[in-house]
């Protein structure tokens, strides 16, 4: 049985709300907020899609291991890269034994294919940066042939810029490759969106293959794409904006929770973009509608929406969410059915 956690992060994540990000000191004063400042489309591009995997539950709220295995297979078969032990997999709510068991199952099913996994270090406000805890998580992920996604923590994001970059360099020295992660404080109190100067240095760490950007601000993500194109074109800017999944047309790749609901449809959409098929926009509109519905306030309840949707599709046996994660009303299911009907031509 999954037991509720009483950690600070757990209590906060249950209650978090998304608010529209305001203009702040991350925006340059000379930014030009005109159409001309928006990056050009990068059409006919092969998109690298990473999909955060929902950890499904049984009716008695134990982990549905068979449902997890089948969803991993489904995601691999669609051509997406599974991302396990992320927020969608209750990263802040599961214990270490469960975390390792998920890695073991994923490694077995991957059979040498790429997957990524969250390196989550839970700490408290004013905590010191705990490099050893990060290295333990990284070692566990790499021993299971995964690529670590470096979650932020209070200790990490409290560092001054030079110390912060040194910390990522230490992480890089211990990894074959890793994915960075910027998280806005509207999602978690330990999150931080880095300055453009820090970002420019971060993407030059050789082992850092990419970074997920979750500010919910297109302009901030466009700025990162511009820096990427100038400094390191092979670097992956992974959009984490489930409310703007069309960021891929500007050159972002993605690491999304929304895609766990439809890895087949996201993969089909991505192929349409590579082929130059205008049907991309029609399918993207439906998926974005699903995203707006799933990620409405309270945002953490998107995981319950995902469970309802996957159950509706006959992919998991139960639509329950984690007992410490907020839930959605059963009345949502009727709306999800209408969205699923809209998806029918693409299934």
What are these regions (language model features)?
Residues 31-191:
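Active-site beta->alpha loop and helix N-cap motifs at the rims of alpha/beta catalytic domains
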Residues 179, 183-299:
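Catalytic alpha/beta core domains of metabolic enzymes, predominantly
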Residues 7, 16, 25, 29-30:
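N-terminal cationic leader/targeting segments used for protein routing and processing
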Residues 37-38, 51-54, 79, 252-253, ...:
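C-terminal alpha-helical cap/extension of soluble enzyme domains
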Residues 2, 22-25:
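N-terminal polybasic/positive-inside topogenic patches
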């Amino acid at each position: 049985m999954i037991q509720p956690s009483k950690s600070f992060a757990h209590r906060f994540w249950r209650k978090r709300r998304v608010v529209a990000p305001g203009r702040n000191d991350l925006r340059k004063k000379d930014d030009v907020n005109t159409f001309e400042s928006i990056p050009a489309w990068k059409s006919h591009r092969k998109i690298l899609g990473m999909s955060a995997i929902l950890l499904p539950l049984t009716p008695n709220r134990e982990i549905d291991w068979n449902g997890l295995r089948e969803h991993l297979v489904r995601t691999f078969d669609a051509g997406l890269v599974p991302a396990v032990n992320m927020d969608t997999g209750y990263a802040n709510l599961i214990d270490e034994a469960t975390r390792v068991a998920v890695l073991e199952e994923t490694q077995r099913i991957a059979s040498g294919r790429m997957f990524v996994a969250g390196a989550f270090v839970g700490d408290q406000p004013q905590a010191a940066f705990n490099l050893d805890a990060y290295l333990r998580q990284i070692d566990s992920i790499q021993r299971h042939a995964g690529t670590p996604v470096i979650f932020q923590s209070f200790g990490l994001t409290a560092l001054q810029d030079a110390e912060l970059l040194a910390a990522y360099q230490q992480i890089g020295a211990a990894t074959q490759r890793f994915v960075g992660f910027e998280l806005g404080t509207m999602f978690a109190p330990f999150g931080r969106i880095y300055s453009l100067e820090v970002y420019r240095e971060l993407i030059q760490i050789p082992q850092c293959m990419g970074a997920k950007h979750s500010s919910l601000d297109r302009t901030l993500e466009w700025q990162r794409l511009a820096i990427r194109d100038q400094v390191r074109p092979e670097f992956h800017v992974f959009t984490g904006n489930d409310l703007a999944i069309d960021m891929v047309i500007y050159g972002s790749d993605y690491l999304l929770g929304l895609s766990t609901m439809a890895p087949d449809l996201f993969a089909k959409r991505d192929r349409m973009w590579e082929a130059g098929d205008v049907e991309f926009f029609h399918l993207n509109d439906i998926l974005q509608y699903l995203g707006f519905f799933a990620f409405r306030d309270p945002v953490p309840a998107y995981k319950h929406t995902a469970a309802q949707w996957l159950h509706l599709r006959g992919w998991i046996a139960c639509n329950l969410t984690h007992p410490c994660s907020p839930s959605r009303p059963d009345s949502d299911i009727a709306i999800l059915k209408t969205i699923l009907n809209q998806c029918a031509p693409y299934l």
